[in-house]
């Protein structure tokens, strides 16, 4: 008698069950979602996000479907907002409802279970951390206290450029990153840091991983996926390296504190955080642990370098493309400084430089798609139901190119901000490169001061020309952790105002 053989495939069964799971989720979606393009089975609209410049693609879709859209990215239900008006509705009027962040593997592993202020879940710990940032870490007084470090490091950068100013093209981004990493390391963990170079290399490796849109984050129910793609192993390896560096830094500082009788060790961010840790008591509602300190310090270094370097590189690019604006900027800083060394305190006198920075943030925001928020509860907006757990993504790049907000939005025109009340504090939703509402970046003042000092110093001391054979500067973008130049900016510096010792 023949025995019937049953052909059984575990992968096929897995795919079938997963398909049913996704189908049930789609059937349970509210019927009055915002409009959007058709969704494919399982992947939804992922194929429309898989482009070199997703912020451009999303703007094109918004032109067709409107300033509020619903897209499906794998398992993630996403609401895309492309207007200043609706950004204010969500981030302002419904700020509490969208105060959370999606839980991501990169933030969980690399930032000690999302213990930094950017990705920490909304709650008592996050509120306490925001207060620490506002009062202790990045208050205006704290930023002013960093001015000596910034001035010293900018002087070192300018001298390096001046010593190499022999007609050879310079990769401007690298010089700015050297300045920013040095400044952020000194303000965060002190001037003497064993392992600082390794920390910098680790930060670069992590930013490279987080630059891409991770498919693993869009299918959270597929727990095995990060192991298949190798992401979990890669993050684990980097996390182990990072933790060893930061543990050594903290141990070294605590040892110094034990033998110190003064408070010099509390003048940088690490010193302040360790002081807060020592003040923990049984009555303290939220305690600062070593892992929290490591997450905060590393997040500050990572966030404070990449975006500022990208912004100033775009500033120089636009000024080279627009020689009239370059002349105005250089004339201003050279007339104000009159041959003297430029310092952090001097940037407040440079109105046109600030206008250039604002215009660059409008046209080339470091985060064209603001970090996603996650809805903590269902909300009603414009007659649509926004489901709980939906991601809210503001396409700020589209807001910056909105012809209803900006006259001739494709034109680089810093003068549009002359005598304008619009600033980047989060109150004017047409200009929110640092976000808005409860989750606005707490480092606005520090980042803006660094950008202004960098740009003013570079165009004050040097004239810049294109390398031989380059007739026109390209402005192609590369989307990743931020929006940077696809081809790094190479310029030849010519010393005009020599750097003084």
Swiss-Prot record:
It is a single-pass type II membrane protein. It is an enzyme of class 1 (oxidoreductase). It catalyses: (19E)-geissoschizine + reduced [NADPH--hemoprotein reductase] + O2 = polyneuridine aldehyde + oxidized [NADPH--hemoprotein reductase] + 2 H2O + H(+); tetrahydroalstonine + A + reduced [NADPH--hemoprotein reductase] + O2 = alstonine + AH2 + oxidized [NADPH--hemoprotein reductase] + 2 H2O + H(+); ajmalicine + A + reduced [NADPH--hemoprotein reductase] + O2 = serpentine + AH2 + oxidized [NADPH--hemoprotein reductase] + 2 H2O + H(+). The chain crosses the membrane at residues 3-23. The strictosidine aglycone-producing AJM7-DeltaHYS yeast strain expressing pathway genes of the VOM module, RsGS, SBE (GsSBE, RsSBE1 or RsSBE2), RsPNAE, RsVS and RsVH, accumulates vomilenine. Additionnal expression of pathway genes of the AJM module, RsVR, RsDHVR, AAE (RsAAE1 or RsAAE2) and RsNNMT, leads to the production of ajmaline. Ajmaline is an anti-arrhythmic alkaloid commercially used as an efficient drug for the treatment of arrhythmic heart disorder. Signal peptide: none annotated. It comes from the Eukaryota. This is Sarpagan bridge enzyme.
